[in-house]
Amino acid sequence: MKTGHFRNKMLTLLTILGLGPVHAEPQQGLLDHDTRRLGSEETVNLKEAYGGKVVLVVNTASRCAYTGQYEGLEALYAKYQDRGLVVLGFPSNDFGGQEPGTEAQIKEFCRLTYSVKFPMFAKTQVKKGAADPFFTGLGETAGRYPKCNFHKYLIGRDGRLVDDYLSRTSPQSDEILNAVEALL
């Protein structure tokens, strides 16, 4: 096991137990960003809409090896939304042009192919150096930015980052399920 990975897992456990934050950087306002809903002109302040909930933020794409994770994300959302979990999807074309469609096309793909009901937002840049302010905050707080689609950031009810997960980590993995359960 990598030292950094072990350290992050131990800090996650301590945070869940209320013994300290995972990341020492200030996190006030991590969710305090306005963003536009996918395929709409409606703007949402994430803190106002989702503050007090457990939030799983995911950068998504329709033509990625991990696109099938939409199914697991929707299942996670359906299972836990009544207990206070929300999954927030942010399509991105940052990695190999794997999200080339318009927002209308992305919205239709998600609805028809995976019956996505969790909130989806405007196409977003997430890579370090070009990321929008929300993903810059997530990347800087976590100490890493997405390097591929379906990178996940888990935020607790207090608005603080609890952990982040590489793209290969399934939304149905024990790692994510246990962390979500502990926060709910």
Segments predicted by a language model, with ranges:
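N-proximal helix/coil linker or "cap" segments that precede and/or mark the start of modular domains
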Residues: 6, 10-33
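Structural microenvironment flanking redox-active thiols in thiol-disulfide oxidoreductases
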Residues: 66-131
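Conserved hydrophobic packing residues within short motifs/helices of P-loop NTPase cores
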Residues: 55-58, 88, 153
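Proline/glycine-enriched tight loop/beta-turn segments at coil->beta junctions
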Residues: 49-54
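Terminal helix/beta-alpha structural elements that buttress the NAD(P)+-binding lobe
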Residues: 32-34, 122, 156, 184
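Amphipathic alpha-helical repeat scaffolds
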Residues: 59-63
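Thiol-/selenol-based redox modules, centered on thioredoxin-like
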Residues: 133-136, 140-184
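N-terminal "domain-start" segment that seeds a small globular fold
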Residues: 23-48, 68
